[in-house]
Amino acid sequence: MDKTLVSAIEDAFARYSTLTVEEIEDSIRPTVNRVIDGLETGAFRVAEPDNHGGWKVNEWLKKAVLLYFRVHDTTIVDAQPAPFWDKVESRFSGYDAVKFRAAGVRVVPGAIARRGSYFGKDVVLMPSFTNIGAYVGEGTMIDTWATVGSCAQLGAHCHLSGGAAIGGVLEPLQASPAIIEDHCFIGARSEVVEGVIVGHHSVIGMGVFISQSTRIYNRATGEISYGYVPPYSVVVSGQLPAKDGTHSLYCAVIVKQVDEKTRAKTSINELLRGLAD
């Protein structure tokens, strides 16, 4: 990590509201652009594995993203069928066939990706929205009307189904974006937000909503947890009764956990069938 670069971002962010036009043009804007370029290439990640089975948030990168809005003016962003009026350029602005082939990303008409987002090889972007600072691993499909929020992390070989959303976060700085680890399937119209982590090889069924306050009930153990779905979990929406028995409230239910061999050879539909048994 370039400590000089980190220090420059930290110093500029500490003076966010008092930055002068001269220093923005002379040094801060080029420095911020360098960081955003690093996010696009994958050299930097807002959140990354901590080598202890967890994740760490690089707050200085979130500060750089926020500074991007401070040091850039709103301008015309060319697009079809009509231009945009924004501070953030399109991720693929100025791309030609050579650049698209080098990137290895398939971008379908209607897909919107903002500058500062990263896409691995063989990513497919259907008409969808990916925000600044987001990370999308290789071989992942972002399906129609799906949303990847600012700084959200989506691993390799995942499928974010139609209308699903992965929540991002810029403030507070210490807050983590939603993180979907490798080989996960997120069902249509589901949402994972507020820094929830979905462990690798998990399947989230259609219409499941998980935030930090959502109870996650493990049917096999009876355990209730928050904010984390263990690897190889199959999750659907459900309800848990209130203590007084007068009503029930929404929860996410881990209906089963499968091993690596079963997950590899079993289709998503097969995993989700017979869950009421």
Curated annotation (Swiss-Prot):
Lineage: superkingdom: Bacteria
Broad class of enzyme this protein falls into: transferase
GO terms under biological process: diaminopimelate biosynthetic process; lysine biosynthetic process via diaminopimelate
Subcellular location: Cytoplasm
Pathway connected to this protein: Amino-acid biosynthesis; L-lysine biosynthesis via DAP pathway; LL-2,6-diaminopimelate from (S)-tetrahydrodipicolinate (succinylase route): step 1/3
InterPro entries: DapD_Trfase_Hexpep_rpt_fam, Hexapep, THP_succinylTrfase_dom1, THP_succinylTrfase_N_sf, Trimer_LpxA-like_sf
UniProt KW keywords: Acyltransferase, Amino-acid biosynthesis, Cytoplasm, Diaminopimelate biosynthesis, Lysine biosynthesis, Repeat, Transferase
Pfam families: Hexapep_2, THDPS_N_2
EC number(s) given by UniProt: 2.3.1.117
GO CC annotations, alphabetized: cytoplasm
GO terms of molecular function: 2,3,4,5-tetrahydropyridine-2,6-dicarboxylate N-succinyltransferase activity; nucleotidyltransferase activity
Catalysed reactions, as listed in the record: (S)-2,3,4,5-tetrahydrodipicolinate + succinyl-CoA + H2O = (S)-2-succinylamino-6-oxoheptanedioate + CoA
Residues annotated to bind substrate: 106, 143
Subunit description: Homotrimer.
Family per similarity comment: Belongs to the transferase hexapeptide repeat family.
HAMAP family: DapD (MF_00811)
Protein name per UniProt: 2,3,4,5-tetrahydropyridine-2,6-dicarboxylate N-succinyltransferase
